[in-house]
Each structure stands twice: as structure tokens, then as C-alpha cells.
């Protein structure tokens, strides 16, 4: 365990502890201690093995969060297999009978695993904190590979801090001062050293984790409140008060009856009109080959809110389009459009040879300019089709005229100015993300609470014994140290209580129904809902 050497007949300050009294325990007392510790050890092993198997068989659990929990389960499994049983044997026998090498190996393994648990909790806390406070920048870097690197560093730091000192200290000082029938860390015989290791290995990490969790909790509550305000502002009554007649998005339009056009499509885009006062318009020259100028447009929403019929047909002003494009358009010789560029690019085409037979393709002015590689965002506009007097060119495309559609752009970047359906989808997505964040925060809070409850009593005794070496009874030392081990038993229970997927997977594995469930799912996708 971290920061202290009570694996032996000495307390943290080096005062000898008489284990002979333990040898005089009654038979039933020994049986009770052995049975209780064996049950706790078995629960620890089974619980953490279930965590590992669940992570292996259930793909839903293979998230970045659970990679850290998997590492924590590995440390807890080591404690459940080795530390609990060896320490119980040492207590009941009253002496160490396995030799000095086995003692040093056990202490190194115990301290490395215990410190790795603390380091993993620190990593989990920082991961949650950055995920909440820096969702855009941090989550892009939050990959399983990076999680593996952080986990490896946690174990490496724990190993470097404890293993060399425990295994090599006797060679550095020239002799082994630990008696043959005792098992303790030689360099932790001084109270001041033990006190310093307890501060560095427990109190500082706990303080950091507590501060991080408080900030995580505040940020999560703030997001919950913001989401509630967003849902309230997007109520049905408020949606009805809006003026959808001033907002239009077109599905996609313009197609020439050439079957090879679809094969030439490379990018998707939408168009949006800017206000006429932002730029001047010009008249484009006619393109000689339209096939290279058609790009497929994905449906954004229904074009049902613009004024229609005669009002549109009578309009004669040239359309003004604001290019907010992030897509590279290769330069095509022989095609020119009259454009004007400021900080943003504005294009004003008056199409002459376009078709509106099927709403699949639209003419893109990006063919006239070589733009930097970027993605296109939504453009807003309306389409006017002159039904009478339409003419066809040699390419088989009819005349169409595009008129700007008024679209009030909200200065507020929230979803209030969006289409109600789109706003609902965005709100739903935010709610789902928030639910996941709250679940992860709940799991973290349960793990931290269990860690603090189980480790604090022992580390308080470490501080007390530094100033009063005979104030802590031997039995209390044993209970406090064993309670630190119990934390490894509680952690898998926390996962099951706070994570429904873990809980369901644990249940299926314990009932030996996991293979049956996989077969049922396979048959379900084949059209059967039950096993024959």
C-alpha cells in the first residue's frame, strides 16, 4: 500500500508490534478471520474479472472511459489475488515464513498496484474534467490510443516510484536491516519518511481529485440548466409565433437529363442567399459545357415557406448568393461567372441554361474559381421557374431564374433561429451528450467516494502515529490497512451500480447467458426473434 510499511511487525514509525498475541487467537476467531477475508478476496477477484470479460465481450463497453476502468480493475485484481491473502496469512501466523525475496517481491507488487490505483483515479478525474470543460479541443484527441498511453504512464510512474527502492534499498545501504521473520519496507522505518510518503501518495492526490470533481459537478449542473432553458425556449407556442415565410431552404434542384452527370458528382453543398445590400450583382457568361458544373445537393429541408406563384415569377432582380464554402472547386476552362469577393465571396448567377426536371442537381458557381479545400455549409435561397416560354438549349436544359429569398439570420448562435425540426434534433443530441456526461460523472463520484472512505482511516492513523507512536492499537492498524484493500472489492460494485450496460453484462455472464444472447441476436437479424 502507498506511503507506509505496515506489512510487518512494526508500525509506521518503526515501533515493534508483537504478533505473538495473534498466534494465541482462538480457533473460531482464526476461522472467522480467514473465512471473511477469503470471501472478500473471492469477491474482489470475481468482480474485477467480470469487468475485464465484460469489456472484452461487449463492444458497447469499449469506450475511452472504460479503458481507464479496465486498468483500475487490473490493479484491483492484483490486490485481490496476492495482497489480501498474503497479508491475512502474515497476520494469522504472526511471522513471515516465505523468505526475504518473496517479501520484497510482494511489497513491490502491492505498492505498485496500490499506487497505480491512485494514479488511474487521477487520470480518470483529469479526463472527465477536460471532457467537460474543453469538449471541442480535448474530445478530438480523446482516443483509445491516447488512453492507452496515459494508462501506461500511470503504471510506469508507479513502478519507478516504488519497485526499485523496495527491491534495491538494501544493496544501496550495504545491508538488510529487516529481520528474517518480518516483512517490511526497509527505508520506511523512519516516521518522517512515512509521513512524507502518505502526504504525497494520498492527501495530495485526494485533494486534486476532490477539486476536479467539484468543478466537474458545477459545469455539469450549468449545462443541465442551459439545456433546460434551451428546451423551454423551443416550446411549441414559441415555434408557432415565428414567421416561417421568411425562411426557406431548398432540397436540391437543377438537373440536366444526362445520365453521366451523377457519376461526376464529387461534393455536396447547399446554398444560402445573403442580403442584397451586402454586394453588387453581375451577369455571368453562358457556360459551354454544363456537365462539369453540376454538383449534387443534399436535402436540407422543405421549400415550403417562400411566397410562390405570380409574385415569384414577376421578380426580375438578380439573385445574390453568399458563398460560405469549404470545398475545393477545380478551375474549369471556358466557364466564367461574374463574381465579387470581399472577406466573403459573393456570387450572383443568372442562369440561362438550366433544367428543373428532377430536383437532384444544381449549378455550382464554384467551378469558376479555385477555392481552398473546405466544406460547404448551408446557403439560403429560393427558386423561380418560368413555366411559360421555356426554351431548351442544345444540352437539353431549360431556363430557370433564381431569386433571393428573405431569410432573417439570428445573431444569437443558439437554435432559436433554426428550423423547429432541426432545433429539436440539436436539443436532443445535446441532451444525450449531457446524459452520458452525467453518468460518467456519477461513476467517478462513486469511485472517489469509495476510495476516500476506505483509505482515509489508515492514512489518518499514519499522521497520528508520527506524533504519538503508541496511540494506535495494533488491531486498529490491521483493520485500517485491510480496509484499503476493500476498496478493490467495492470498485466493480460501483461500476455495476452506476452503469446499466455493465450491470446487464455482469448479470448475463453470471447466469451463463451471454452466448445465448449472442445467438438470439443473430437469429433476430435473420428474421427470428426466439431460439427454436
Swiss-Prot record:
Q: Which UniProt keywords apply?
A: Cell membrane, Disulfide bond, G-protein coupled receptor, Glycoprotein, Membrane, Phosphoprotein, Postsynaptic cell membrane, Receptor, Synapse, Transducer, Transmembrane, Transmembrane helix
Query: Which residues does the annotated region (Disordered) include?
Result: 265-290
Q: Which InterPro entries match?
A: GPCR_Rhodpsn, GPCR_Rhodpsn_7TM, Musac_Ach_M5_rcpt, Musac_Ach_rcpt
Q: Where in the cell is it found?
A: Cell membrane; Postsynaptic cell membrane
Q: Name which cysteines form disulfide bonds.
A: 103-183
Tell me which parts of the chain lie in the Extracellular compartment: 1-29, 88-104, 170-191, 465-478
Q: Where is the composition biased (Low complexity)?
A: 270-281
Q: What is its main location?
A: membrane
The membrane-spanning stretches of this chain are 30-53, 67-87, 105-126, 147-169, 192-214, 444-464, 479-498
**Which of this chain's residues carry glycans?**
8
Cytoplasmic topological domain? 54-66, 127-146, 215-443, 499-532
Transport: present as a keyword of the record?
no
Which topology term describes how it sits in the membrane? Answer: Multi-pass membrane protein
Q: Mention any Pfam family matching this sequence.
A: 7tm_1
Q: Which GO terms describe its molecular function?
A: extracellularly glycine-gated chloride channel activity; G protein-coupled acetylcholine receptor activity
Question: Which PROSITE patterns does this entry report, sorted A to Z?
Answer: G_PROTEIN_RECEP_F1_1, G_PROTEIN_RECEP_F1_2
Residue numbers of Phosphothreonine PTMs: 501, 505
Matching entries from CDD domains are given as: 7tmA_mAChR_M5
Q: What's a BP term from Gene Ontology annotated to this protein? A: regulation of phosphatidylinositol dephosphorylation
Sorted alphabetically, the Gene Ontology cellular component annotations on this record are: postsynaptic membrane
Q: Which PANTHER family match?
A: 5-HYDROXYTRYPTAMINE RECEPTOR (PTHR24247), MUSCARINIC ACETYLCHOLINE RECEPTOR M5 (PTHR24247:SF209)
Instruction: Provide the family line.
Output: Belongs to the G-protein coupled receptor 1 family. Muscarinic acetylcholine receptor subfamily. CHRM5 sub-subfamily.
The protein's role, per its UniProt record: The muscarinic acetylcholine receptor mediates various cellular responses, including inhibition of adenylate cyclase, breakdown of phosphoinositides and modulation of potassium channels through the action of G proteins. Primary transducing effect is Pi turnover.
Its name, as the record gives it, is Muscarinic acetylcholine receptor M5
Q: Which organism is it from?
A: Mus musculus
